[in-house]
């Protein structure tokens, strides 16, 4: 029972701060940029799709990693890939992983995604150690790709 109760209490203590939008945001340096290197915007590709992330002016660091004094490492973060999303997630709250919001909290700089045939959009958001977008947010341009249907075997 204690194993279940403690996480519930912890969530109860944390959630009010999140709900009130009082989560501090980590500053991003001027000129910081994130981009999708591959695939190129407008291209037709075969699945599964290799996506390579690019970053300028900041460093990649695993989520949750802090300095010995408990403060986050400056000018660092990790990638979040938005797949087929209409709008950006909240920039002031932790981003919640889903089928359309993929986390790369181990510091990954590329991935392979299985997308069905058809048009798809991809966009990156670079976030801090707590999965919260920097201030100002470091967000890539949204790209559109087309995934080819696999040829049927005869």
Language-model features: locations:
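A beta-strand/beta-hairpin structural motif
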Residues: 92-111
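Short amphipathic, basic-aromatic surface patches that mediate peripheral association
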Residues: 54-71
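Short, well-structured beta-strand segments within conserved domains
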Residues: 49-53, 109, 118-126
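Short, compositionally biased P/S/T/A/G/V-rich stretches that sit at domain boundaries
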Residues: 21-49, 56
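A glycine-anchored, Pro-Gly-centered beta-turn/N-cap motif
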Residues: 47, 77, 116-118
């Amino acid at each position: 029972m204690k194993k279940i109760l403690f996480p519930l209490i912890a969530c109860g203590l944390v959630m009010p701060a999140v709900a009130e939008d009082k989560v501090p945001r980590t500053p991003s340096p001027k000129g910081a940029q994130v981009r999708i290197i591959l695939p190129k915007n407008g291209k037709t590709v075969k699945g599964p799709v290799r996506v390579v992330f690019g970053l300028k002016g900041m460093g990649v660091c695993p989520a949750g990693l802090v300095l010995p004094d408990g403060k986050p490492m400056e000018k660092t973060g990790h990638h979040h890939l938005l797949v087929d999303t209409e709008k950006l997630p909240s920039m002031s709250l932790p981003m919640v992983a889903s089928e359309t919001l993929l986390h790369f909290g181990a510091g990954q700089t590329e991935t392979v995604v299985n997308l069905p045939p058809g048009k798809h959009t991809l966009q990156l958001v670079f976030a801090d150690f707590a999965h919260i977008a920097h201030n100002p947010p470091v967000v890539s341009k949204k790209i559109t790709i087309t995934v080819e249907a696999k040829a049927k075997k005869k």
